[in-house]
A protein has these predicted regions:
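Soluble N-terminal interaction domains of secretory/endomembrane membrane proteins
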Residues: 1-154, 160-164, 171
Length: 173
C-alpha cells in the first residue's frame, strides 16, 4: 500500500466484527474493539485519537464501519473510506448474510474489498477530496432546505390561525 495511512479496517454488527483487514501488526485491532464496545448505537460518526492514530467509526443501521489511520492522514480520507465501504457492504449484504454472520466469517469474502478500498483511497486523494467537498455541499443544501421547510410549516400554521381568527370575527359581526 506504499505509505502507511490507512492501517486497519473492519465492519461489525453491534459488537461482533464480521470482516476485517490489515497489512500491519500492532495493538490497533484490540484498541478498535474496545472503542467499538463503548460506541453509542445511534447512527453517527465518531473519531478517537490514540498513539498517533485516529480510530474512525461510522455507525449506520446497526452496523459499524471502522478504519484506523495515522494522525497525519487528512480528516477527509478516513471519512470517505468509511462511506465507500458502508455503501459497498450495504449493497453486497443488505438483508442477507450480514444479519446472521458469525464473528469474522465475512473476512475472507469482504476483507479483499476492504483492502481494495483502502488502497484506492490512499492512491486517489484528489478524488477523495472532491468527493468530500461535494458531500459537504450536499449536507449544507440539505440543512438549508430543512430550515426552509420548517419556515414554510410555521407560516402555514400562522395562516391557519389568521383564517380561524377571521372566521371568529365574521361570526361575531
Amino acid at each position: 500500500m506504499g505509505q502507511q495511512t490507512l492501517i486497519y479496517s473492519f465492519v461489525a454488527r453491534g459488537t461482533v466484527i464480521l470482516a476485517e483487514y490489515t497489512e500491519y501488526t500492532g495493538n490497533f485491532s484490540s484498541i478498535a474493539s474496545q472503542c467499538l464496545r463503548k460506541l453509542p448505537a445511534s447512527n453517527n460518526r465518531f473519531t478517537y485519537n490514540c498513539d498517533d492514530h485516529t480510530f474512525n467509526f461510522l455507525v449506520d443501521n446497526g452496523f459499524t464501519y471502522c478504519v484506523v489511520a495515522t494522525e497525519s492522514a487528512s480528516r477527509q480520507l478516513p471519512i470517505a473510506f468509511l462511506e465507500r465501504i458502508k455503501d459497498d457492504f450495504s449493497k453486497r449484504y443488505s438483508g442477507g448474510k450480514a444479519t446472521t454472520a458469525t464473528p469474522k466469517s465475512l473476512s475472507k469474502d469482504f476483507g479483499p474489498k476492504l483492502k481494495e478500498q483502502m488502497k484506492y483511497c490512499v492512491d486517489h486523494p484528489e478524488e477523495i477530496g472532491k468527493f468530500s467537498k461535494v458531500k459537504a455541499q450536499v449536507s449544507e443544501v440539505k440543512g438549508v432546505m430543512m430550515q426552509n421547510i420548517e419556515k414554510v410549516l410555521d407560516r402555514g400554521e400562522k395562516i391557519e390561525l389568521l383564517v380561524d381568527k377571521t372566521e371568529n370575527l365574521r361570526s361575531q359581526v
